């Protein structure tokens, strides 16, 4: 996912 928030949730 290109973005910041969703990537953070994924991590």
Curated annotation (Swiss-Prot):
Protein localization: Secreted
Gene Ontology terms: cellular component: extracellular region
Tissue specificity statement from the Swiss-Prot or TrEMBL entry: Expressed by the venom gland.
Gene Ontology biological process terms in this record: proteolysis
Record key words, sorted: Blood coagulation cascade activating toxin, Disulfide bond, Glycoprotein, Hemostasis impairing toxin, Hydrolase, Protease, Secreted, Serine protease, Toxin
Changes after translation: Glycosylated.
Spans traversing the lipid bilayer: none
One Gene Ontology molecular-function label: toxin activity
Assigned EC number: 3.4.21.-
Subunit structure: Monomer.
Function description: Thrombin-like snake venom serine protease. Releases both fibrinopeptides A and B after 90 minutes incubation, but only fibrinopeptides A after 10 minutes incubation. Clots fibrinogen with different clotting time depending on the species: bovine > dog = human > goat. Fails to clot both rabbit and cat fibrinogens.
Family: Belongs to the peptidase S1 family. Snake venom subfamily.
Protein name, UniProt field: Thrombin-like enzyme albolabrase
UniProt source species: Trimeresurus albolabris
């Amino acid at each position: 996912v290109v973005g910041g928030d969703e990537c953070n949730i994924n991590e």
